[in-house]
């Protein structure tokens, strides 16, 4: 490949990478605004999108279909209380969750979680990771 053509290709590749980086930053800003205080979920989304954003940028049909917007938004989030009696006879109340992320290829994966240490961000992260 002639040197001038090679430089042109390298410049174009850098431009594509920068454009994807800008779009990734903008997309992540929107995800964070819709899902504040869910840092585990933000991290999972960033890791996946940093890999797929260049492909999405080169295939506008996926942008038009809003594929990224669809995969980061759960279809359903169920939040419920779980009252129970501990070994001392004391009533305890925990919050339970079920995140149903995407049913495009069949039933939802995952289960119910109601441990006191979990929160919505952790469970959205787990559900998001299971759709790939």
Predicted feature locations:
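N-terminal ligand-binding/catalytic initiation module
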Residues: 4-9, 18-132
